[in-house]
Structures are given as C-alpha cells and as structure tokens.
C-alpha cells in the first residue's frame, strides 16, 4: 500500500 491512512490510535 502506498497510501498511509491517518487513522487515530485508539487504545483497546
């Protein structure tokens, strides 16, 4: 994957 989706880091 070339596109890095900026997903928020949500702790479990």
Swiss-Prot record:
Any Gene Ontology CC annotation: extracellular region
Modified-residue entries (Pyrrolidone carboxylic acid), positions: 1
Annotated source species: Bothrops jararaca (Jararaca)
Chief localization: secreted
Family statement drawn from the similarity comment of this UniProt entry: Belongs to the bradykinin-potentiating peptide family.
Compartment annotation: Secreted
Its job: This peptide both inhibits the activity of the angiotensin-converting enzyme (ACE) and enhances the action of bradykinin by inhibiting the peptidases that inactivate it. It acts as an indirect hypotensive agent.
This protein's name: Bradykinin-potentiating peptide 12a
Tissue: Expressed by the venom gland.
Segments forming a coiled coil: none
Record's keyword terms, sorted: Hypotensive agent, Metalloenzyme inhibitor, Metalloprotease inhibitor, Protease inhibitor, Pyrrolidone carboxylic acid, Secreted, Toxin
GO MF terms held by the record: peptidase inhibitor activity; toxin activity
Signal peptide location: none
């Amino acid at each position: 994957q070339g596109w890095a989706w900026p997903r928020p880091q949500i702790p479990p």
